[in-house]
Every structure is written in structure tokens, then in C-alpha cells.
Curated annotation (Swiss-Prot):
One of its GO terms (molecular function) is DNA-binding transcription factor activity. Keywords: 2Fe-2S, Activator, DNA-binding, Iron, Iron-sulfur, Metal-binding, Transcription, Transcription regulation. GO terms for cellular component: cytoplasm. The keyword Membrane does not apply. It comes from Escherichia coli (strain K12). This is Redox-sensitive transcriptional activator SoxR. CDD domains: HTH_SoxR. SMART domains: HTH_MERR. SUPFAM superfamilies: Putative DNA-binding domain (SSF46955).
Amino acid sequence: MEKKLPRIKALLTPGEVAKRSGVAVSALHFYESKGLITSIRNSGNQRRYKRDVLRYVAIIKIAQRIGIPLATIGEAFGVLPEGHTLSAKEWKQLSSQWREELDRRIHTLVALRDELDGCIGCGCLSRSDCPLRNPGDRLGEEGTGARLLEDEQN
């Protein structure tokens, strides 16, 4: 006897998307308010999502995890046709746009880690070796904050 596969629903409720994607329903509404995802309304005016929203939510979660702002995610999604299901090739192109920003952040974090034990050019002059690294607070003339680290970021 042949087993029938369960029918896959074309449209999902917000609760189903939330459960499957691991985000709160309120997050889905927020993403929608920012134009990152779209829903349709049924006859009872309830939101329904196409299944491809699961991929978009997964991309949003990954991008947020690596520190990509929602505005940047929105810009990347903005070039795609509405309701378009993202292919693996398109995901690769999309993620490559964020690679440079991610590399910059990694470089900054490595520099911060490596400088934690040394002077960061903050102008405090409280460490015994600050007069050697920052005599007379010369870095203060360049601006405020941790000048040695901030200069590396720019």
C-alpha cells in the first residue's frame, strides 16, 4: 500500500512561521513593518505568509547574528522582486556584499583583543607607560576616545 505524503501548506500562519523559524510573532510583525518580509491577508483579515518567508527570516537571523544592521539587510532585499524565492546562487551573491563589512569587524575585534593589555590612546595618562606611548597626550589633539583603536577602524 502506498503512503501518501502530508500535503505541504502553501500559506503559513504567523504562529507556524514563528515556530518553524525560531523567532517571535512580534519579530515577524517588526520585520514586516521594516519591509523585510511580506504577508497577505485572508478573508478574516489575518496574516498569512508564503513558505519562502522562512528563507528570508533565516537570512535575517544570520545577518543579525554577524552584526549586519536591518537597514542594510533591507537594502539587499530591496533589489529582489517581491515574493521572490531566493536561490542558493542569489544567497551567495547577497552574502558576498556583507563579507567586506564582516572582515572589517573581525579586524577591529582582533585589534581590540590584542590591545586590551596595552595603551589604547585614551588620554588617561594613568598607566606608567602612557607617557612613553602618548607623551603629553598628543593623541588628544587628534580627537576624543581611544585614538589608537579608532584610527585602525577608519
